[in-house]
């Protein structure tokens, strides 16, 4: 019976330890509730009393402004990565954080510039906010479709109220609001073509529970470029890549969470309601009649499609337009049929598809593995197929969007050919 008494002692000790842990958690939660006092704070904006907002202390300045109807852009979802939620605090600014120091110059910091996503509201503040952010609004959209257009990319199509059209420009983006949610990735098969199942099964991506029911609303927004152009309203489209954890032994690392916003979007089904806000953006078309070259990879397809369709189908532009699109294989290519149709219809539009890792089935269909302009990294194919033949590369406009490595490779290449940064429009917040 000695072993039984020993087992009993272990059980009692374990139970006591667990109970102590639960008690400590309860004490911490109660302490936060009763000891951390929430008090009203006034945000005086642009020295205009009519714009003064009263908010609760303790939240980020970004969240407080959003709750007050002032839609400061935060494409990265409040992670201090995009550096776009800049606000100047003209009175009562706290000491800058490291994220502020890495964003602003010493003079700007002294002037009160801060990242609103990192600044906590603890007392009254006086702010300067750009007037354009007062024009941003929110819309409720209904999911029309949410199908995979590549293994890890969905095309989310929403319908908004036609009596309230969203006044966006091609190259712009909207922020998608993510409510608390819980999903099982196996349910995503409902909006996924079976051709994509095998890759998901190889990496054990199905039957994964993603629980964000206790979501922190301060970080529950993310911006996505619009794949649609204004003439397609009341429909709006996005291309969204799922942010999986890193893979360990061909399975997602269980210690690292899935992307909050992309997982929410992948869980959406026709009929679901989605809140979007905006519009925002700076990567618009420069109307100077220079020929335009689009260098697009992956989910950057949103950015390219919006501009190209607007130029050709809406503005009937006669500018020379060239699209270089990079994908791993034909299965990962997006909007190929649409672009091939446009190329036949518009003599000023040229479409080049480049595959970095064509599948055997692609080769069986006739894809030329040995052609370096068709099978290559996109930046190398572009250099061989067009850039090296341009007499004056600096006379062109370059619109760039894709994964981080794609973007950096393109920027380095263009710099080597003497292209000024002012001739490059880069959309990289989603990288």
Curated annotation (Swiss-Prot):
Any one GO cellular component localisation term in the record: plasma membrane
Stretches that traverse the bilayer: 10-30
SUPFAM superfamilies: 2Fe-2S ferredoxin-like (SSF54292), Ferredoxin reductase-like, C-terminal NADP-linked domain (SSF52343), Riboflavin synthase domain-like (SSF63380)
Domain FAD-binding FR-type residue range list: 136-286
Co-factor binding details: Binds 1 [2Fe-2S] cluster.
EC number(s) per entry: 7.2.1.1
Recorded topology in the membrane: Single-pass membrane protein
GO biological process, alphabetically ordered: sodium ion transport
Domain of life, per lineage: Bacteria
Catalytic activity: a ubiquinone + n Na(+)(in) + NADH + H(+) = a ubiquinol + n Na(+)(out) + NAD(+)
Gene Ontology molecular function: any one: 2 iron, 2 sulfur cluster binding
Cellular location(s): Cell inner membrane
Binding positions ([2Fe-2S] cluster): 76, 82, 85, 117
Cofactor(s) this protein requires: [2Fe-2S] cluster; FAD
Quaternary organization: Composed of six subunits; NqrA, NqrB, NqrC, NqrD, NqrE and NqrF.
Family: Belongs to the NqrF family.
Function of the molecule: NQR complex catalyzes the reduction of ubiquinone-1 to ubiquinol by two successive reactions, coupled with the transport of Na(+) ions from the cytoplasm to the periplasm. The first step is catalyzed by NqrF, which accepts electrons from NADH and reduces ubiquinone-1 to ubisemiquinone by a one-electron transfer pathway.
Protein name: Na(+)-translocating NADH-quinone reductase subunit F
Lineage: Bacteria, Pseudomonadati, Chlamydiota, Chlamydiia, Chlamydiales
């Amino acid at each position: 019976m000695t072993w039984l008494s020993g087992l009993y002692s272990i059980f009692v000790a374990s139970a006591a330890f667990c109970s102590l842990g639960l008690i400590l958690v309860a004490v911490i939660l109660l302490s936060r509730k009763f000891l951390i006092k929430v008090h009203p704070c006034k945000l005086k904006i642009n020295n205009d009393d009519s714009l003064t907002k009263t908010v609760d202390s303790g939240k980020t300045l970004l969240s407080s402004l959003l709750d007050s109807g002032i839609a400061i852009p935060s494409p990265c979802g409040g992670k201090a990565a995009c550096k776009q939620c800049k606000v100047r605090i003209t009175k009562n600014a706290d000491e800058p954080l490291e994220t502020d120091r890495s964003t602003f110059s010493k003079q700007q910091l002294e002037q009160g510039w801060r990242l609103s996503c990192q600044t906590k509201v603890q007392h009254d503040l006086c702010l300067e906010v750009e007037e354009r952010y007062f024009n941003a609004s929110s819309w409720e959209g209904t999911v029309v479709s949410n199908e995979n257009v590549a293994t890890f990319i969905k095309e989310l199509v929403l319908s908004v109220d036609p009596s309230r059209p969203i006044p966006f420009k091609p190259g712009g983006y909207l922020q998608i609001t993510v409510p608390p949610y819980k999903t099982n990735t196996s349910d995503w098969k409902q909006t996924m073509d079976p051709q994509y199942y095998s890759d998901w099964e190889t990496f054990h991506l199905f039957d994964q529970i993603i629980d964000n029911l206790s979501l922190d609303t301060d970080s529950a927004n993310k911006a996505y470029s619009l794949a649609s152009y204004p003439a397609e309203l009341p429909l709006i489209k996005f291309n969204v890549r799922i942010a999986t954890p890193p893979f360990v032994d061909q399975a997602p690392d269980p210690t690292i969470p899935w992307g909050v916003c992309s997982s929410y979007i992948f869980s959406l089904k026709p009929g679901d309601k989605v809140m979007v806000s905006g519009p925002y953006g700076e990567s618009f078309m420069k109307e100077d009649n220079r020929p335009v070259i689009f260098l697009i990879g992956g989910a950057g397809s949103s950015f390219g499609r919006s501009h190209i369709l607007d130029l050709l189908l809406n503005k009937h532009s006669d500018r020379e337009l060239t699209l270089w699109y990079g994908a791993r294989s034909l299965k990962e290519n997006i909007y190929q049929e649409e672009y091939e149709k446009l190329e036949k219809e518009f003599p000023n539009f040229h479409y080049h598809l480049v595959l970095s890792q064509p599948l055997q089935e692609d080769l069986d269909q006739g894809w030329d593995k040995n052609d370096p302009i068709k099978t290559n990294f996109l930046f190398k194919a572009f250099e061989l197929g067009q850039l090296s033949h341009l007499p004056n590369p600096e006379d062109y406009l370059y619109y760039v969007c894709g994964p981080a490595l794609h973007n950096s490779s393109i920027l380095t290449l263009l710099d080597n050919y003497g292209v000024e940064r002012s001739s490059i429009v880069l959309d990289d917040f989603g990288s």
